[in-house]
């Protein structure tokens, strides 16, 4: 086992090392959003000890559907590439996994055997019997091989959760380990760019995060000779943009009902606070049946969407909101505007539409760095629940929306105002009055709670006669920990 230089992932590497050194049969599932770096992590950690590595065929083929025969042939070729003797191609997954057993037995020298099967959900085509064969392979052979470490990966997170991690059939309780790989944090993004010789300020790293959400596959395309704006144009708006069809590829490779999932995401992208299940069904024209529930579950499992209960609402009033930064950017600029200008981002950086998007996108960055915000506020050890507040307006009163409240176990609530401005932020008299009225409304409705206005911004808060309305302050550097 090699320990290479990998950005971040210290906890995950330590877990993989523990499984490797356990001295018993291990069956480990690694899952997470597509492009997050699962394959890279496993390849780098186990490169010298991998006796078999296979990747399922992507279902994203515009010419025809990938069939069971295609997947079996691909698996057979992987066996041949790794040194299996040339015998008849398997006609079923039962035969295919039996061939894998025979191959592993012939090359067993007593040392740890790492078997890595990547994009496992892609291999489970309709009525293929794949899952039954996988059960037979592990239950009837693999779990008795003390030197076997089976690692499986998948970007279709809902499949991984339903069929492996929460399996109620033959694989129930058979996994010995699971690792969910998350996108990079801002700090890890900074380390990544530095390792590639890319010089960027934290202000620009944060803007890049607003667009790519800490996904290393996207960040790897950055050209060190370009500015951030030039890189964004090259990735999204150039005639041969490297991510020119990424949105379609992303959904078609992960979701069974890709078009319907895209329809849901497009609707969720129209409001940052999200919508109820009923609103989503009504506006998309979908029947809120079992398939609709599965699609929402799949979107949540793959970290595109999150479900939450707004502050002060009952548990039955749940909202679904889009949290994937790449999708937010794509829908707002690439798809909505149907841009054909190759230097679009460089030309429109200072426009109001971009400034408005930055404000919302920064809020999402903050929501993905809650632990860093809590650490900066010295409440890291306090149990809390994060949510938004949605108050619809009426003829008698104005509505109100607060995108982040940290409801703490000590009965205090941090009411976070998130601002993304290049210059230091100064509170005006008018805005101080707005904030005061919000606090009064919250206190009247929740008299047992203490509400603390908290500034979260990329720049410092200007000290003036109104700034003391904020009881605490978190700046950009605090998010880079």
Question: Where are the predicted features?
Answer:
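Phosphate-binding site recognition
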Residues: 1-348, 352
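A cross-kingdom feature that marks ATP-driven nucleic-acid transaction machinery
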Residues: 311-313, 318-481
């Amino acid at each position: 086992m090699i320990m290479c230089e990998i950005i971040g992932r210290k906890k995950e590497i330590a877990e993989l090392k523990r499984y490797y050194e356990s001295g018993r049969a291990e069956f480990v599932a690694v899952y997470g959003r597509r492009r997050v770096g699962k394959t890279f992590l496993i390849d780098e950690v186990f490169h010298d000890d991998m006796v078999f590595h296979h990747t399922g065929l992507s279902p994203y083929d515009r010419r025809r559907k990938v069939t069971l025969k295609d997947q079996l042939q691909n698996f057979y070729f992987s066996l041949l590439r790794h040194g299996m003797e040339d015998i008849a191609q398997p006609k079923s997954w039962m035969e295919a996994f039996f061939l894998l057993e025979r191959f592993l037995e012939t090359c067993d020298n007593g040392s740890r055997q790492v078997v890595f099967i990547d994009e496992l959900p892609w291999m489970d085509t309709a009525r293929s019997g794949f899952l039954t064969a996988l059960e037979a392979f592990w239950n009837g052979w693999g779990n008795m091989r003390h030197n076997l470490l089976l690692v499986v990966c998948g970007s279709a997170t809902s499949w991984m959760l339903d069929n492996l991690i929460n399996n109620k059939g033959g694989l129930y309780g058979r996994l010995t380990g699971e690792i969910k790989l998350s996108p990079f944090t801002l700090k890890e993004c900074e380390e990544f760019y530095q390792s590639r010789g890319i010089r960027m300020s934290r202000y620009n790293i944060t803007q890049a995060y607003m667009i790519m959400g800490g996904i290393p596959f996207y960040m790897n395309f950055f050209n060190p000779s370009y500015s951030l704006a030039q890189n964004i144009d090259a990735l999204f708006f150039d005639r041969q943009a490297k991510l020119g069809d990424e949105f379609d590829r992303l959904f078609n490779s992960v979701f069974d009902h890709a078009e319907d999932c895209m329809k849901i995401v497009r609707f969720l992208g129209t409001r940052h606070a999200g919508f109820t299940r009923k609103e989503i069904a009504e506006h998309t024209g979908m029947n809120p049946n079992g398939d609709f529930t599965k699609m929402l579950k799949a979107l949540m499992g793959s970290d595109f969407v999150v479900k939450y209960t707004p502050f002060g609402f009952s548990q039955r009033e749940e909202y679904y909101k889009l949290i994937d930064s790449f999708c937010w950017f794509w829908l707002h600029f690439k798809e909505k505007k149907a841009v054909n200008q190759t230097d679009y981002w460089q030309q429109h950086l200072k426009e109001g539409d971009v400034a408005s998007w930055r404000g919302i996108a920064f809020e999402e960055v903050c929501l993905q760095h809650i632990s860093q915000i809590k650490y900066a506020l010295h409440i890291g050890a306090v149990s809390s629940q994060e949510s938004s507040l949605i108050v619809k307006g009426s003829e008698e009163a104005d509505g109100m929306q607060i995108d982040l409240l940290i409801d703490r176990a000590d009965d205090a609530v941090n009411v976070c105002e998130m601002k993304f401005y290049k210059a230091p932020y100064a509170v005006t008299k008018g805005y101080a009055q707005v904030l005061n009225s919000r606090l009064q409304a919250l206190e009247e409705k929740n008299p047992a709670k203490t509400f603390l206005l908290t500034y979260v911004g990329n720049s410092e808060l200007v000290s003036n006669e109104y700034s003391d309305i904020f009881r605490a302050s978190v700046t950009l550097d605090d998010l880079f920990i």
